[in-house]
Design a protein with these regions (language model features):
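N-terminal, positively charged/glycine-rich alpha-helical extensions of SAM-dependent methyltransferases
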Residues: 1-11
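Class I SAM-dependent methyltransferase Rossmann-like catalytic core
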Residues: 9-22
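Conserved alpha-helix/loop element of class I SAM-dependent methyltransferases that forms part
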Residues: 20-38
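Class I SAM-dependent methyltransferase SAM/SAH-binding core
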Residues: 43, 49-98
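A short SAM/SAH-binding and catalytic strip from SAM-dependent methyltransferases
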Residues: 109-121
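A short glycine-rich, Lys/Arg-flanked "PGG" loop and its adjoining helix->strand segment in the class I
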Residues: 123-138
Length: 162
């Protein structure tokens, strides 16, 4: 992966805030080819502890709406404030399977990193999200997976503990 921003980030902070795969690294790779400009409004849907939101706000100077069902807005607000991101990242509690509380044509980009598989594994979620995008906006999703098929007897050593 080509992730120089993540590679130079505070490793202890990343390890303390990861809830699975390194969401900052995945986000950096995911959005590298997208036309992100300063001031864009981005919905980070299923942001967890917000490291994907932090990358989007710091690296791209975007305004990020960090939406998660399980991590409280207060917890994320404290984390964002510690990094000087008050006014750049707005933490919210959102259940994506219910009403999404935003205006239509509001976001330039909607991202979901290591979360979409929990709420979007159906035929309606993408259609539900589209009205919230501005014309020409993008939806970018990263979900965990393997590059190839593995039989149970031939799993890579790094995966066996899981």
């Amino acid at each position: 992966m080509n992730t120089p921003y993540t590679d130079s980030y505070d490793r202890a902070f990343l390890l303390d805030t990861m809830m699975g795969p390194n969401a900052m690294r995945l986000t950096e790779e995911l959005v590298a080819q997208l036309p992100i400009a300063p001031g864009m409004r981005i919905l980070d849907l299923g942001c967890g502890k917000g490291i994907s939101s932090i990358l989007l706000a710091e690296k791209y100077d975007a305004t990020v709406f960090a939406a998660d069902l399980w991590i409280t807005p207060d917890e994320n607000a404290a984390r964002f404030s510690e990094r000087g991101l008050d006014g750049k990242i707005f933490p919210l509690r959102v259940d994506a399977t219910k009403e999404i509380p935003f205006a239509h044509d509001y976001f330039d980009l909607i991202v979901s990193v290591d979360a979409y598989q929990y709420f979007g594994n159906n035929d309606v979620m993408l259609g539900t999200l589209l009205p919230f995008l501005k014309p020409g906006g993008h939806i970018a999703v990263a979900v965990p997976g393997f590059i190839g098929e593995y039989s149970e007897t031939h799993l890579p050593d790094v995966v066996k503990p899981f």
